């Protein structure tokens, strides 16, 4: 992708970059990156679309790797794959939840929180209803995923200050423990298996999207579990919680004992479950009831019904003398009747007898009481218990919905969370399993329609280039179960069997078995097996038993039982759980009662319609084993789930499709702010149609055409990274607008502050004088008439500022120094300089040092390399109170000897050189008035305690002596003549303009660059010039030399002066004063500037010519300098051109081929560089290839600013045509004035060179010279400035250069250095 990702977002490291071999070279290769200890190491790939091979086995291998590394989540595009770890991994903490707030899925590892964040973000951003479909077999972790999504949305969407919204949030979260207790149970495959379906819909307010209501839809509770379970399974959790930890008042009221007492909780021989704390869960259930708002009376009624179910289950039967069923223990029946508030005799009759009514047309028939046998009586007893629990559960759901209804505020936006039973295959599968698996087939059909089929159909409809993918459509299986015509399905056959033989269940089962042959006659997904049948589901083949299916499909209580509960004196039973209309519906012969298959079919279709109206998210859960043990991974079982879930097809679809699509209108509505052509100040300004606006937006955002396609009505974005980048730019638009307003305000405040400070400073100076200049005058007075002065020291603008390194600042280079060496005092003076050190058996050396002065001490700090790392160390600490005298010479040098009263090997006398020596002397004298200042032609100090050494100073005129420095050799310092000792600083020059330069408030970066280029002021803390330091006078770039042979070359004439159109008008904008563009210097001035940069004074290095840089040959040097440094807004007075020079410089030779550092390759194709660590390639561009590793090459741009890996097949070796450089131009011939200037001993490079090239021909012949020298000088100054301002990293390199370049003061050792 060719655009920048969302700001502050880290790229997921999904691919390994080819490792760079540790070859030789000084660079040492790519350094190892810092490891983030908070981020786990990536194992496998986090998105299956990144797999190199798309097979079921490859998907399984990747999931296995991640599972064993406790990484259970993996993506397929936007689909989340979750593998149940069967243990707590600690990944659902509040701290981890906060990491996903406001983050897109590529910034953070795959997680269910990322899916929840995406849903909530899309709800707010696009106003679309959201839903998440969680699918997988039983025990794969669907319920846990639903709980965590609810937890996340409740946390990120709720305003804690709003009591009503916080209450809704708490109630939504409380539904989890409540419905788990009443609707989940332990099965062979899952300790917390959902035995019902649940669709939770959270409704949000308009505008701020706070949860204001919720609604739960229940689907098909498995009520058969109340009365019977398979061995090693359990009843619903609430029965074990209630019987184990029942409150004392309920024990007395309802006679509750342990779970082993009751048949319904002990028959399966599984009372306790590892990892399940029934006591804690029961407290959570009670707390949830209180949060939801159940009154104490309602809670009593709930537990009363649970107790009645348990005691009904304990009713047992014996045969009487006629073989009919009789109650074994009347006390049990009596206690159950007490709990139901009915007559015990009526309860007994309803269980062991059946009432049959006959009718003859319109005449009333007879009523018979038919006794039941033990099997029939047991079925009636169980039907009563199942009916009570089923209706109780449905009432709890309705009661919860009443509490969750919240305010009456209208809301049209919602997030739905579907937690429904997973696909089931048992040894014996009956009606419950066919209903459960039917619902899962419908969910699979939704997944196919919404992800696979709909995606391909949309591409065809929108005329998008697309490669069709084959997939299995399970609609044929859904029709096999639910269809009514033309071929009736299983549910229709069940209903018809009940209608044919409604009185006899066994007869109805036989009728159903006969009709199966017609149901699946032409369906290859169905097989009839005599009393059983097989359906080939998407998840596997399942064998179902016919026996008992018709009876379970009736889903209606017997009339005797309804009449029983209608006689109850408890209004909760006869009005709430069993309202009177139930009995009326049962006796109405005009309408067939609704069967269980009708209910589940109707609910499933409503669910499909609801989900189809939402933007779906998908979580596909996988169960890794059947043992429910952590770190147990069954490859065959997981591979089977991968196949029936269709993960491979999903990956193939994702790899070939588009991640995002939107209508043109909606896309423009969302992103028109990103283009200046479509949006201005938040308003839509485009006048064209929507598709042209889309093109303009994508063009302005630099989205390459390969990242999107335009259909007939929609725009398709290929990768999610592109969408995230667009969203990020949109988010930043408003931040940028806010930042613009903030900048304007801060600019206004800064102008006021600066103006106030200017007035305050001016008043202080007028009233009390300038303290820095006063201290300067004090320091100069100490040396007045005794020592020659440097010209830079006598500038009127010179002031003694003290802390030149900024040690007293809160941050920066100076603060870095004192923190490193541990100086805790306030710094009075700080500067860089040199010290003369004598090593054992070697000559004295001038070494760079840092000098810091506090109230008590002088700290001399050395920069040393320890294991290739820069360290600052205190070399000497000199107490100011112990200083005896300061020794200086009478000349203009910068040497100072600090002599102590009692020097020691650790605190010796020092001989130092620094530009601010006068200020240092003044500071020390002020701190210790008893210090003596000795000034003479020699300086004496003790190199070692008791060993005095004398340094002699002389006036020299050799070429090795710099104008503004000195030359040290064998104890003698040679220096040029300075200003007279009686020199004084002139008054500070007045500003050239009284107006404030407001440009610095609007474009500070440009103002600095312009100021630096146009008017440079002396910087006193710069290192001593090269010659002054005694270093080799090798220039930073080669001085142009006269070529021996060259070919004349025609060059286009170029004038170094700006044209009239290039000079900005002063009146264009009166509110701002733009910096006047400085014209390029004349060729002769550039040569002079180059020479000045190599060894001349700092002042000469920073001279910038004015509009007309040509000076008169007879004009004094000082006049020329003043002219070139003037930057007033007034026009420069024109001067007469100098007479033409007879001899001109020859033109430059043709370009010569420079051999490249590395082999050069040309890019044959574009490469986007989307892989981490890679570099993008642009077709037909030439690059360096420094290393080849297999199919990858280490590529570097020609300017060596970027480096990374790219496919070597994208490159082709080529000749280095792009590396040609022109030969340096020849220097101009020296004029006669240079010789006379040199004879006088004072050269002025500006005045002597500006008179040589004044004619048009000189400008023409040196046009190439102008650009070459200008670029070289600019590069040299830029490199030098960068070297001076860099901290630790650059200091290390600078120190190595200095140590390598430092030379001995003499080839022979000094005579004093041989003392042992």
UniProtKB/Swiss-Prot annotation:
Superkingdom of this protein's organism: Eukaryota
CDD domains hit by this protein: MYSc_Myo1, SH3_Myosin-I_fungi
Record-linked Pfam families: Myo1_CA, Myosin_head, Myosin_TH1
Myosin motor domain: residues covered: 43-731
Biased composition (Polar residues): 971-984, 1018-1030, 1097-1106
An example molecular function term from Gene Ontology annotations: actin filament binding
Sequence ranges assigned to domain SH3 in this UniProt record: 1156-1216
InterPro entries xrefs: Fungal_myosin-I_SH3, Kinesin_motor_dom_sf, Myo1_CA, Myosin_head_motor_dom-like, Myosin_TH1, MYSc_Myo1, P-loop_NTPase, SH3-like_dom_sf
GO biological process: actin cortical patch assembly; actin cortical patch localization; actin cytoskeleton organization; actin filament organization; bipolar cellular bud site selection; cell growth mode switching, budding to filamentous; cellular response to starvation; endocytosis
GO annotation, cellular component aspect: actin cortical patch; actin cytoskeleton; cell cortex of cell tip; cell tip; cellular bud neck; cellular bud tip; cytoplasm; hyphal tip
Every IQ domain range: 735-755, 756-781
Domain spans labelled TH1: 789-981
Residues reported to bind ATP: 136-143
Localization of this protein: Cytoplasm, Cytoskeleton, Actin patch
Actin-binding: region residues: 414-497
Ranges of biased composition (kind: Low complexity): 1042-1065, 1117-1129, 1233-1268
Biased composition (Acidic residues): 1305-1316
Compositional bias of kind Pro residues: 1137-1153, 1223-1232
Region annotation Disordered: where it falls in the sequence: 1-29, 964-1154, 1209-1316
Transmembrane annotation, as ranges: none
Swiss-Prot/TrEMBL keywords: Actin-binding, ATP-binding, Cytoplasm, Cytoskeleton, Hydrolase, Motor protein, Myosin, Nucleotide-binding, Phosphoprotein, Repeat, SH3 domain
Function of the protein: Type-I myosin implicated in the organization of the actin cytoskeleton. Required for proper actin cytoskeleton polarization and for the internalization step in endocytosis. At the cell cortex, assembles in patch-like structures together with proteins from the actin-polymerizing machinery and promotes actin assembly. Functions as actin nucleation-promoting factor (NPF) for the Arp2/3 complex. Plays a role in chitin deposition in the cell wall, in determination of the budding pattern, and is required for hyphae formation.
Domain notes per entry: The myosin motor domain displays actin-stimulated ATPase activity and generates a mechanochemical force.
Family that this chain belongs to: Belongs to the TRAFAC class myosin-kinesin ATPase superfamily. Myosin family.
Name of the protein in its database record: Myosin-5
Organism for this UniProt entry: Candida albicans (strain SC5314 / ATCC MYA-2876)
Lineage: Eukaryota, Fungi, Dikarya, Ascomycota, Saccharomycotina
């Amino acid at each position: 992708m060719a655009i920048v990702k969302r700001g502050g977002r880290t790229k997921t490291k999904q691919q390994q970059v080819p490792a760079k071999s540790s070859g030789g070279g000084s660079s040492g290769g790519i350094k190892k990156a810092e490891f983030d200890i908070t981020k786990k190491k990536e194992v496998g790939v986090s998105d299956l679309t990144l797999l190199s091979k798309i097979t079921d086995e490859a998907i399984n291998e990747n999931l296995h790797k991640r599972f064993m590394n406790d990484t259970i989540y993996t993506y397929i595009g936007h689909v989340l794959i979750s593998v149940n770890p069967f243990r707590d991994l600690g990944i659902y903490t509040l701290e981890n939840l906060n990491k996903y707030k406001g983050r897109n899925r590529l910034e953070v590892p795959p997680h269910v929180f990322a899916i929840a964040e995406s849903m909530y973000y899309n709800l707010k951003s696009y106003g679309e209803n959201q839903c998440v479909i969680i699918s997988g077999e039983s025990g794969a972790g669907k319920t846990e995923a639903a709980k965590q999504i609810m937890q996340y949305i409740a946390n990120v969407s709720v305003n804690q200050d709003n009591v009503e919204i916080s209450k809704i949030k708490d109630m939504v979260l409380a539904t989890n423990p409540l419905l788990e207790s009443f609707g989940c149970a332990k099965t062979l495959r899952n300790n917390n298996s959902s035995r019902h379906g649940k669709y939770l819909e959270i409704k949000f307010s308009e505008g701020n999207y706070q949860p204001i209501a919720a609604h739960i839809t229940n689907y098909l509770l498995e009520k058969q579990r109340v009365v019977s379970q398979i061995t090693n399974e359990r009843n619903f959790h609430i029965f074990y919680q209630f019987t184990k930890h029942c409150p004392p008042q309920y024990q007395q009221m309802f006679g509750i004992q342990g779970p082993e007492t009751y048949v319904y909780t002990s028959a399966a021989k599984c009372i306790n479950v590892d990892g399940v704390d029934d006591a804690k869960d029961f407290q959570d259930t009670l707390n949830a009831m209180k949060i939801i708002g159940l009154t104490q009376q309602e809670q009593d009624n709930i537990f009363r019904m649970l107790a009645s179910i348990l005691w009904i289950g304990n009713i047992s039967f014996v045969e009487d003398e006629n073989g009919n069923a009789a109650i074994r223990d009347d006390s049990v029946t009596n206690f159950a009747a007490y709990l139901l508030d009915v007559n015990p005799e009526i309860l007994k009759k309803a269980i062991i007898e059946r009432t049959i009514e006959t009718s003859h047309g319109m005449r009333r028939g007879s009523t018979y009481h038919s006794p039941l046998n033990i099997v029939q009586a047991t079925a009636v007893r169980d039907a009563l218990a199942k009916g009570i629990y089923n209706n109780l559960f449905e009432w709890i759901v309705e009661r919860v919905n009443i509490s969750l209804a919240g305010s009456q505020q209208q809301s049209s936006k919602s997030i739905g969370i579907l937690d429904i039973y997973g696909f089931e295959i048992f040894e014996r599968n009956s009606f419950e399993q066919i209903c459960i698996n039917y619902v899962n087939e419908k969910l699979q059909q939704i997944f196919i329609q919404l992800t696979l089929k709909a995606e391909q159909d949309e591409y065809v409809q929108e005329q998008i280039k697309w490669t069709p993918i084959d997939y299995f459509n399970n609609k044929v299986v859904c029709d096999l179960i639910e269809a009514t015509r033309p071929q009736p399905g299983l549910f229709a056959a069940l209903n018809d069997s009940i209608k044919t033989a409604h009185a006899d269940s066994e007869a109805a089962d036989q009728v159903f078995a006969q009709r199966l042959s017609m149901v699946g006659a032409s369906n290859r997904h169905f097989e009839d097996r005599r009393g059983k049948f097989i359906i080939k589901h998407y998840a596997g083949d399942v064998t179902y038993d016919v026996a008992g299916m018709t009876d379970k499909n009736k889903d209606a209580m017997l009339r005797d039982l309804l009449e029983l509960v209608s006689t109850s004196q408890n209004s909760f039973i006869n009005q709430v759980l069993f309202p009177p209309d139930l009995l009326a519906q049962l006796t109405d012969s005009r309408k067939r009662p609704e069967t269980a298959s009708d209910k589940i079919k109707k609910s499933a279709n409503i669910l499909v319609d609801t989900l189809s109206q939402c933007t779906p998210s998908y979580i596909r859960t996988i169960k890794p084993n059947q043992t429910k043990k952590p770190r147990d991974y069954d490859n065959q079982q997981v591979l089977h789930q991968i196949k029936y879930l269709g993960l491979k097809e999903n990956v193939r679809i994702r790899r070939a499709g588009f991640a995002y699509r939107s209508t043109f209108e909606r896309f423009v509505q969302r992103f028109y702010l990103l283009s200046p052509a479509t949006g201005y100040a938040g308003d839509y300004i485009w006048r064209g149609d929507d598709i042209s606006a889309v093109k303009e937006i994508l063009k302005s955002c630099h989205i390459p055409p390969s990242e999107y396609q335009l259909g007939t009505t929609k725009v398709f974005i290929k990768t999610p990274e592109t969408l995230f980048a667009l969203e990020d730019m949109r988010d930043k638009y408003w931040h940028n607008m806010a930042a613009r307003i903030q900048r304007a305000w801060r600019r206004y405040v800064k102008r006021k502050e600066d103006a106030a400070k200017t007035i305050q400073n001016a008043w202080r100076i007028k009233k009390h004088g300038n303290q820095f200049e006063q201290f300067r005058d004090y320091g100069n007075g100490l040396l007045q008439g005794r020592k020659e002065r440097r010209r830079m020291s006598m500038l009127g603008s010179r002031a003694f500022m003290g802390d030149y390194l900024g040690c007293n600042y809160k941050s920066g280079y100076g603060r870095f120094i004192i923190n490193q060496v541990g100086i805790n005092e306030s710094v009075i003076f700080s500067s860089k300089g040199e010290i003369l050190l004598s090593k054992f058996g070697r000559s004295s050396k001038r070494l760079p040092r840092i000098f810091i002065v506090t109230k008590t001490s002088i700290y001399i700090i050395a920069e040393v390399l320890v294991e290739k790392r820069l360290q600052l160390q205190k070399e000497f600490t000199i107490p100011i109170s112990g200083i005896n005298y300061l020794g200086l010479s009478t000349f203009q040098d910068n040497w100072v000897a600090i002599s102590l009263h009692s020097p020691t090997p650790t605190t010796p006398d020092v001989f130092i050189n620094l530009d601010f020596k006068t200020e240092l002397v003044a500071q020390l004298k002020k701190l210790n008035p008893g210090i003596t200042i000795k000034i003479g032609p020699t300086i004496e100090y003790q190199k070692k305690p008791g060993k005095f050494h004398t340094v002699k100073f002389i006036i020299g005129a050799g070429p090795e002596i710099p104008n503004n420095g000195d030359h040290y050799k064998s104890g003698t310092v040679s220096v040029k003549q300075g200003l007279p000792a009686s020199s004084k600083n002139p008054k500070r020059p007045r500003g050239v303009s009284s107006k404030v330069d407001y440009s610095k408030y609007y474009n500070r970066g440009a103002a600095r660059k312009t100021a630096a280029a146009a008017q440079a002021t002396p910087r006193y803390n710069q290192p001593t010039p090269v010659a002054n330091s005694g270093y080799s006078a090798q220039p930073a770039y080669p001085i142009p030399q006269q070529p021996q042979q060259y070919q004349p070359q025609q060059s286009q004439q170029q004038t170094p002066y700006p044209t009239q159109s290039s000079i900005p008008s002063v009146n264009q904008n009166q509110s701002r004063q733009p910096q006047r563009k400085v014209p390029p210097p004349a060729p002769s001035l550039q040569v002079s500037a180059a020479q000045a940069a190599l060894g001349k004074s700092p002042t000469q290095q920073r001279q910038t010519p004015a509009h007309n840089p040509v000076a008169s040959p007879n004009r004094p040097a000082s006049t020329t300098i003043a002219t070139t440094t003037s930057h007033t807004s007034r026009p420069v007075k024109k001067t007469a051109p100098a007479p033409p020079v007879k001899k001109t410089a020859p033109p430059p030779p043709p370009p010569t081929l420079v051999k490249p550092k590395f082999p050069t390759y040309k890019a044959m194709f574009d490469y986007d560089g989307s892989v981490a660590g890679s570099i993008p390639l642009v077709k037909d561009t030439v690059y360096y290839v420094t290393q080849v590793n297999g199919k990858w090459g280490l590529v570097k741009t020609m300017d060596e600013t970027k480096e990374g890996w790219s496919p070597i097949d994208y490159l082709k070796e080529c000749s280095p045509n792009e590396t040609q450089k022109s030969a340096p131009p020849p220097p101009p011939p020296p004029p006669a004035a240079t010789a006379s200037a040199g004879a006088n001993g004072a050269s002025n490079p500006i005045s002597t060179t500006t008179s040589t090239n004044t004619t048009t021909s000189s400008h023409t012949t040196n046009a190439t010279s102008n650009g070459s020298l200008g670029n070289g000088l600019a590069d040299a100054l830029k490199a030098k400035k960068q070297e001076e301002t860099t901290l630790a990293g650059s200091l290390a390199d600078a120190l190595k250069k200095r140590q390598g370049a430092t030379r001995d003061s003499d080839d022979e050792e000094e005579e004093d250095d041989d003392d042992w």
